[in-house]
Amino acid sequence: MNQQDIEQVVKAVLLKMQSSDTPPAAVHEMGVFASLDDAVAAAKVAQQGLKSVAMRQLAIAAIREAGEKHARDLAELAVSETGMGRVEDKFAKNVAQARGTPGVECLSPQVLTGDNGLTLIENAPWGVVASVTPSTNPAATVINNAISLIAAGNSVIFAPHPAAKKVSQRAITLLNQAIVAAGGPENLLVTVANPDIETAQRLFKFPGIGLLVVTGGEAVVEAARKHTNKRLIAAGAGNPPVVVDETADLARAAQSIVKGASFDNNIICADEKVLIVVDSVADELMRLMEGQHAVKLTAEQAQQLQPVLLKNIDERGKGTVSRDWVGRDAAKIAAAIGLNVPQETRLLFVETTAEHPFAVTELMMPVLPVVRVANVADAIALAVKLEGGCHHTAAMHSRNIENMNQMANAIDTSIFVKNGPCIAGLGLGGEGWTTMTITTPTGEGVTSARTFVRLRRCVLVDALRIV
């Protein structure tokens, strides 16, 4: 994507957000303010109460409990408000963030001693941090960012996507109420009643805010880069490929691919977006996928579906995804072309060429293109091409260590998953902590509290070395 393309996307996103006809939200009891100035001022006061590690631990424990307690309600509200995703999967995301986001335990000071004395390097807070959150993972991102940022000693001003403002505000209020009930300060987490693009743009330049955390697509990340000179931690788009070679456990691969590509109707940037499979095992893999609540489309059906899902396809084959179909259920997408599939269908898949718009474009819906290749070398090369330089996430199913090593090195993504669904890289079924903010564009990768601190050094010369 060149600079002109990015500018056009940014303009389209800003126009969409500005023209939102969502009715004004009521101001909630706690954490939601009528004005941005009042919200930031309240967060500044609250942040002063986070000086002690014990208070951060108390607040985080309250967030974990409230996040898990209200996980289902927030999942239902998110689907109801945005029309995207699956309640059960959003519930799983919310619970995972409440349980698996690291707290203060991942922050350790460094101490250096030598002939010239002692040096202490500590993790200092930024103060009030601005967090821009998406419509795709609204409550989960609020829970995750709240824990990570508070663990680092920060309070947070959230700028939620207008299409998910109700669920985002509800999450912020519930977490604030839990913190206060546990004895913590009010308004550690704040937002405004009617967030819009102007809210985000003001935060990009707001005095006294030194750190911006942006979780969203390419357009919002580019907008942040263009409009701020503050420290920016940004999570952007991805088009994760999954490769299956001839040595793979095909039954396991089929199960993992359908699970990952259909999780929350494919609206997570880390979900599998294109399947590349070696020809000798392609037919068997697709047969096994059909046994996992996935339906294979014919080439004719895919041709009918293409103009429904994609507009403005350019010379590279890349199109603009119709927002009306992002994150919708597979059965509803099939019905758009008069195709009746079982309601429990989780995924539609179709064999395409490598140049097909479905393969080139990040669809963010449960429609998976499948591309055959002659061998694993071709598969890896195509995976690198279709990933598009996002360096976000990729996966491979193989029993060949050398093949996995070659792909891991070639693809150069923040997350690389072997023999499992891509969501395992987010701590959903794999080892490691959870996050909803994978910051590939700015290089921090899978974020935690360690991402959101300032390192400060204190040096004592010629003293306190005891050996």
Locate the predicted segments by residue.
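N-terminal Rossmann-like NAD(P)+-binding subdomain of aldehyde/semialdehyde dehydrogenases
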Residues: 2-120, 148, 291
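Structural signal for hydrophobic packing residues in well-ordered secondary-structure cores
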Residues: 14-21, 40, 44-51, 63-71, ...
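ALDH superfamily catalytic-core signature
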Residues: 30, 143, 222-347, 353-354
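Flexible, glycine/charged-enriched surface loops at secondary-structure junctions
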Residues: 53-58, 185-189, 265-268, 295-306, ...
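Rossmann-like NAD(P) dinucleotide-binding subdomain of oxidoreductase/dehydrogenase enzymes
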Residues: 109-252
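Short, surface-exposed amphipathic charged segments that create phosphate/polyanion-binding patches used
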Residues: 204-207, 249, 311-321, 362, ...
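Conserved C-terminal structural/oligomerization subdomain of aldehyde/semialdehyde dehydrogenase
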Residues: 339-467
